[in-house]
């Protein structure tokens, strides 16, 4: 928790998030084991402690998301899943897959969340340089069931996910059922119950690869070189080496941590959250950064009349 707090120090200590300025992590100090460290040095220190605790990268990326993934030496914090002992449910997979795709696995689906155009571009989808993690994280193209048989739509045509047809609103378009690359990442548990939401794969919240990318980022922000940590993550999937610039680190976090719930926080930390991209327009006055935080609910302000609504709302 300390390393995650410190990597976001400039956000947490920013009293005015609408002035386009952030505190400098080099000037934010912590006492760590009797030593005064700045925010970035603190991140590096705690990430190194994970290595001392014998956390490491799994040789195979997908091992972290397999059925019965408890033995992973990379996963640090997970939500335990067990059909007998717990009632936790994984909603993401259920929401993303097409109805017939999920049905072919004996599950159910909502035909929902898909990869954005920006995500496809970051992964290099469809190019010779496509990142190896795309096929692990996303379903795209023709779909097959667990026995290898083709999956069809209700009209008898083959179910083909079309990643580039994704848009904010595809209602009443020819691609209403098939637009977008869908969430994959977790190995399909054929014994899952509750329409596939109660599975044996533990839900991964934080793992060592994330810590390595945090360390790389902290080193760069502190004026050092973070190439080793960035390329340690990339070499695991045999991706080409890259220099550890902030732009490349943010890109790598999207590649490595897809569907793991960090993107919004990352974009805020890198000052990219309020920009327009692809078909997502910038909201009125969003250049001020006001959407970095949520509005205070009106019922809370009624309970405490001294609270002033956050700027922009």
Please state what every model-predicted region is.
Residues 40, 44-47, 227-230, 246:
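Extracytoplasmic/secreted envelope proteins and their assembly/folding machinery
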Residues 10-166:
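An aromatic- and glycine-enriched ligand-binding surface/loop that stacks and positions planar moieties
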Residues 8-23, 210-224:
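Extended, well-ordered alpha-helical segments in internal regulatory regions
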Residues 132-233:
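C-terminal substrate/ligand-recognition segments
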